Design a protein with these regions (language model features):
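Conserved catalytic core of sirtuin-type NAD+-dependent deacylases
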Residues: 1-123
Length: 123
């Protein structure tokens, strides 16, 4: 009997790839609590500085150059073995895709940095 596995991943799986989390000791919001407002759409739209910071952060983010870690690669092996049926992730770094997991098992709960857009203007 083949066992089927569903996995939920969060920031911890990607910190080893050099992507900072948000709330940990070296997290983005821990170091820059004033920047939490970029995740409030109304504040984001009202404050030009928040928008500029957000776009600059996205452009310079380590997400673009990060490589999948050991845990990402292990999840690919589980899928290849026919065991992984669902991979839900809170991460927006697309490292599961980069590692080789297929789109039919991945659910990006918050989207990905490459597909993000404004919920109001859709840009």
């Amino acid at each position: 009997m083949t066992k089927k596995i569903a996995v939920l991943t969060g920031a911890g799986i990607s910190t080893s790839a050099g992507i900072p989390d948000f709330r940990g000791p070296d997290g983005v919001w821990t170091k820059h609590p004033d920047q939490m407002s970029v995740y409030d759409i109304d504040l984001f739209l009202r404050n030009k500085e928040d928008r500029e910071y957000s776009w600059r952060w996205q452009k310079e983010s380590p997400v673009w150059t990060a490589q999948p870690g050991t845990a990402h690669k292990a999840l690919v092996k589980l899928e290849q073995a026919g065991m992984l049926t669902l991979l839900a992730t809170q991460n927006f770094d697309a490292l599961h895709e980069k590692a080789g997991n297929s789109d039919n098992v991945i659910v990006n709960l918050h989207g990905t940095i490459g597909t993000s857009h404004c919920m109001k203007c859709h840009q």
